[in-house]
């Protein structure tokens, strides 16, 4: 791997940890807050330096458009699409009616063409986030969460799940006797789900985020 300065290594490691933990990279503002930079512009300068050294690639116009490139320290290797290749067409899911599939036609408000390089792996749909329970993970009301359909998830991953009649976005942690759905906002309570509960169904994992207004 190209030799980095101590500060550049801190930024690179922060990006790597964020992708390992949640499936998508941090925003410039999150990098600045975590590492004590005076502004997101300072984070941008370090990101551009890392891009010049060939260890990351930046996608213009996306707050989380950061991809780790190859190397022993990169947990994911992203392949950027060549110009002219077809983008992903992803359905946008709005409100989900109780008891019906998330991807039921009546839930899909529109489709978006998205650069596949924005995501840690290929998503199946975009879910419009409602509320601020995941605020401290950088997921805000109105954001579009890229979701890959899964029936299993690892500890620490951000998931989309059905809980009774509701669809929720939380961080999953296994506990004795069940799982805990962790809110990333102290104003919201975590939710414990007993093992085998008929009220719980995993719908997918987060593989990226598009800030409201970026599409």
Swiss-Prot record:
Active site residues according to the UniProt entry: 133, 170
GO biological process: DNA repair; DNA replication; negative regulation of DNA-templated transcription; proteolysis; SOS response
Record-marked site positions (Cleavage): 98-99
InterPro entries linked to this entry: LexA, LexA-like, LexA/Signal_pep-like_sf, LexA_DNA-bd_dom, LexA_repressor, Peptidase_S24_LexA, Peptidase_S24_S26A/B/C, WH-like_DNA-bd_sf
Enzyme class, spelled out: hydrolase
Domain of life of the organism encoding this protein: Bacteria
GO molecular function: DNA binding; serine-type endopeptidase activity
Catalysed reactions listed for this entry: Hydrolysis of Ala-|-Gly bond in repressor LexA
Annotated DNA-binding residue span(s): 28-48
CDD domains, per the entry: S24_LexA-like (cd06529)
EC number: 3.4.21.88
Assigned keywords, A-Z: Autocatalytic cleavage, DNA damage, DNA repair, DNA replication, DNA-binding, Hydrolase, Repressor, SOS response, Transcription, Transcription regulation
SUPFAM superfamilies assigned to the protein according to its UniProt record, in alphabetical order: LexA/Signal peptidase (SSF51306), Winged helix' DNA-binding domain (SSF46785)
Family per record: Belongs to the peptidase S24 family.
Function text: Represses a number of genes involved in the response to DNA damage (SOS response), including recA and lexA. In the presence of single-stranded DNA, RecA interacts with LexA causing an autocatalytic cleavage which disrupts the DNA-binding part of LexA, leading to derepression of the SOS regulon and eventually DNA repair.
The protein's assembly and partners: Homodimer.
Protein name: LexA repressor
Gene name for this UniProt entry: lexA
